[in-house]
């Protein structure tokens, strides 16, 4: 099994999403001892956001020399995603949605002809065979019956993005309400880590 591990929190060792994503990877390696893991830390080494120059190259323009390294980095993350059987993502909620670093990565893997295609006026996802497991951390509570539900643009966004490319049932493990109190933070982490142990092997 080829496993791609993505972290996007900027909090380093203080990050809950990193703690849970690491536990997920450890669990998968335990039940799949031969798994080959590729790790990308978007918080420590962020990708550049797409610009007009990137889009011009996608339309056939000759890339400027100063863009070459960035284009190579974008091609590398796309190939990492395409090669992976399972993708584990640590995704904290920042201002009601995903970190900007994770958005930059998503922009590099949503590529027509690679992860989705247009056919007959409809979109066809091309990544349907992959498994995606997302470790989510949120400071508050954003469930459907809560006052903050309208502000939930993390899990809902990621479900849509991966569904768009054919991965319609990502596994979500969430640690919610981690900013309410130190006690609740520990309880939320323990609950998430318990859910990790129940993950299916493959």
Curated annotation (Swiss-Prot):
The gene is azoR. It catalyses: 2 a quinone + NADH + H(+) = 2 a 1,4-benzosemiquinone + NAD(+); N,N-dimethyl-1,4-phenylenediamine + anthranilate + 2 NAD(+) = 2-(4-dimethylaminophenyl)diazenylbenzoate + 2 NADH + 2 H(+). This is FMN-dependent NADH:quinone oxidoreductase. FMN binds at residues 9, 15-17, 93-96, 137-140. It comes from Rhodopseudomonas palustris (strain BisB18). Keywords: Flavoprotein, FMN, NAD, Oxidoreductase. Disulfide bonds: none annotated. Quinone reductase that provides resistance to thiol-specific stress caused by electrophilic quinones. Homodimer. SUPFAM superfamilies: Flavoproteins. InterPro entries: Flavodoxin_fold, Flavoprotein-like_sf, FMN-dep_NADH:Q_OxRdtase_AzoR1, NADH:quinone_OxRdtase_FMN_depd. Its cofactor is FMN. Belongs to the azoreductase type 1 family. Binds 1 FMN per subunit. GO terms for molecular function: electron transfer activity; FMN binding; oxidoreductase activity, acting on NAD(P)H as acceptor; oxidoreductase activity, acting on NAD(P)H, quinone or similar compound as acceptor. It comes from the Bacteria. Its EC number is 1.6.5.-, 1.7.1.17.
């Amino acid at each position: 099994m080829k496993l791609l591990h993505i972290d996007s929190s900027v909090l380093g060792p203080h990050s809950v999403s990193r703690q849970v994503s690491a536990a997920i990877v450890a669990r998968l390696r335990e039940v799949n001892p031969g798994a080959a893991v590729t790790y990308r830390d978007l918080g420590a080494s962020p990708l550049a956001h797409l610009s007009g120059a990137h889009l011009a190259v996608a339309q056939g323009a000759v890339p400027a020399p100063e863009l070459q390294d960035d284009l190579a980095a974008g091609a590398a993350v796309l190939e990492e995603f395409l090669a992976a059987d399972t993708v584990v993502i640590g995704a904290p909620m920042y201002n009601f949605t995903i970190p900007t670093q994770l958005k930059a990565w998503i922009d590099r893997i949503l590529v027509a002809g690679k992860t989705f295609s247009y056919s007959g006026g409809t979109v066809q996802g091309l990544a349907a065979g992959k498994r995606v497991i997302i470790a989510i951390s949120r400071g508050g509570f954003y469930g459907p019956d809560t006052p903050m539900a309208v502000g939930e643009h993390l899990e809902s966004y990621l479900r849509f993005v991966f569904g768009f490319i054919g991965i319609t049932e990502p596994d979500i493990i969430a640690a919610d309400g981690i900013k309410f109190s130190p006690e609740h933070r520990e309880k939320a982490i323990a609950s998430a880590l318990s859910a990790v142990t129940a993950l299916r092997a493959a």
